């Protein structure tokens, strides 16, 4: 298991704060572990929480426009 996957597994099990009581999914990251850049969002929105994926809601659409 890579360090990245170990961190993901730790996040999936985390109950260190009250967010664990209200979240639907842990929103981790997607993409290559050896990517040259990483984009980190402030906090997942409702759509990200529902799907368990980062940047799929309105903020993600704005990010897509900004990166074009």
Question: Where in the sequence are the language-model features?
Answer:
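A polyanion-binding, active-site-adjacent surface
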Residues: 1-68
